[in-house]
Amino acid sequence: MAKRDYYEILGVAKNASEAELKKAFRRLAMKHHPDRNPGDKESEEKFKEAKEAYEILTDPQKRAAYDQFGHAGVDPSAGGGARGGASFSDIFEDIFGDIFGGGRGGGSRVYRGSDLQYNLELTLEEAVFGTEVKIRVPSLVECGECHGSGAEKGTTPETCGTCGGVGQVRMQQGFFSVQQTCPRCHGTGKMITHPCKACHGQGRVEEHKTLSVKVPAGVDSGDRIRLSGEGEAGINGGPPGDLYVQIHVKAHKLFTRKGNDLMCEVPISFATAALGGELEIPTLDGRVNLKIPEETQSGRLFRLRAKGVKSVHGGAQGDLICRVSVETPVNLTKRQKELLKELDETMKAGGTRHSPQEEGWLDGVKGFFEDLKFWNK
């Protein structure tokens, strides 16, 4: 199989600068590096292909020969030399030091503390109107005895002899070398010979801290409130993590929430549904009167504008949507049953339809059986 053009492999123009070559190789290597694609032979071959192209095109003499004679003018197997006599492993480390655990030099590594999550349960009223609550959170904080060093008072951590205090060691893997976290000091660059008794050399201790959380009006289940710097303490002087307060709103006995709208089920009597009337409805702002028109059917929705939840982001206020449910009367007396029968008879006697949904359903049933007779002939 013919070898691909080196410029095509890297996806750059033939007049690409050294910075453009480096950027292109970095992108491809991040995508196809064997450590990121274990067992993927295709990615491994693409990485080798990109490496070869980068080595040739970053060497001025080899690039000139390649531009003039193509692949015949260069011998990639001749080595990993590059501009100025630098080895390819140096170039690789320069490009990927931050990906595979740091670069040359530096000191003991610092680590940001882990983020924490706290689940906060609120009532609907607390979520709608906002509130301020106190929470108690377990966390790892800096040891007050050793101030995070992990060493006993009067002593100091020693430099790790394995990595020389860098926290990284270079490992040879096939045709290139990468840096990995030092297995002895675990990346700290230090060894503690006299550990602090309070934290056992960890530099951090577990502690419960009480925090005040301001909950803005309009939050809903799934929302998160971030408290910067209230997570676990960092290592080796690293910055602390953050605390994320996860909101959970408890079910309400009257309302259910959909976005910024509130839903409410309102039972009404048979007489009110037929004759109309006025009901007192609870809202977040107090009580309001809801007019029920004559001949209202069960399931009808009534929307009360701006009686829902104010948006936590400052948008328009939601609505209160009331769904009426016509209740069938129960525990009827003999006289009440007689009156209902009398009403039913008078409704059947006239030619007027009094139950539109029932009449429509009966018409549909009649048509269904007529069709059934046709197909069964």
From Swiss-Prot:
Please cite one Gene Ontology biological process associated with this protein.
Answer: chaperone cofactor-dependent protein refolding
* Entries under SMART domains matching the protein: DnaJ (SM00271)
- Note the CDD domains from the entry: DnaJ (cd06257), DnaJ_C (cd10747), DnaJ_zf (cd10719)
Q: Can you give the residue ranges of the J domain?
A: 5-70
Enumerate the residue ranges forming zinc fingers (CR-type).
Answer: 130-208
Binding note for cofactor: Binds 2 Zn(2+) ions per monomer.
Q: What SUPFAM superfamilies does UniProt report for this protein, alphabetically?
A: Chaperone J-domain (SSF46565), DnaJ/Hsp40 cysteine-rich domain (SSF57938), HSP40/DnaJ peptide-binding domain (SSF49493)
Nucleotide-binding is among the record's keywords: no
Write out the transmembrane intervals: none
Q: Which positions does UniProt annotate for Zn(2+) 1 binding?
A: 143, 146, 196, 199
Which residue ranges contain the repeat CXXCXGXG motif?
143-150, 160-167, 182-189, 196-203
Question: NCBIfam families, alphabetically?
Answer: DnaJ_bact, PRK10767.1
Q: What is known of its domains?
A: The J domain is necessary and sufficient to stimulate DnaK ATPase activity. Zinc center 1 plays an important role in the autonomous, DnaK-independent chaperone activity of DnaJ. Zinc center 2 is essential for interaction with DnaK and for DnaJ activity.
The record's subunit annotation is:
Homodimer.
The family annotation for this protein states: Belongs to the DnaJ family.
Q: Report the protein name in the record.
A: Chaperone protein DnaJ
Q: Which organism is it from?
A: Thioalkalivibrio sulfidiphilus (strain HL-EbGR7)
Upper classification of the source organism reads: Bacteria, Pseudomonadati, Pseudomonadota, Gammaproteobacteria, Chromatiales
Q: Which gene encodes it?
A: dnaJ
